[in-house]
């Protein structure tokens, strides 16, 4: 995928949700909640945003936790990705 976000934006791809609950119930596609964990696939350069210097703290390949209603979902080359601001990333998942 060839995409270059601008400013303090980040492109993420959601990590697939579990299809089976802990009790063994298989969930149909519509019943699964969208995951809030994703992998970073592109990072903008940072720079000045609203007159303030923004340093990008994320890198491609990071697994992140993000705000549920953040960003814009788009389809690029047949893949669904979300473009959001770095501020909408809540945490980096380590380990």
Curated annotation (Swiss-Prot):
A GO biological process of this protein is: chaperone cofactor-dependent protein refolding
Say if the entry is tagged with keyword Chaperone. yes
Q: How does it assemble?
A: Heptamer of 7 subunits arranged in a ring. Interacts with the chaperonin GroEL.
Q: Which keywords, in A-to-Z order, does the entry hold?
A: Chaperone, Cytoplasm
Function of the molecule: Together with the chaperonin GroEL, plays an essential role in assisting protein folding. The GroEL-GroES system forms a nano-cage that allows encapsulation of the non-native substrate proteins and provides a physical environment optimized to promote and accelerate protein folding. GroES binds to the apical surface of the GroEL ring, thereby capping the opening of the GroEL channel.
The record's GO molecular-function terms, alphabetically, read: ATP binding; metal ion binding; protein folding chaperone; protein-folding chaperone binding; unfolded protein binding
Similarity field: Belongs to the GroES chaperonin family.
Main location, first listed in the record: cytoplasm
Give the residues annotated as coiled coil. none
GO terms for cellular component: cytoplasm
Name-wise, this protein is Co-chaperonin GroES
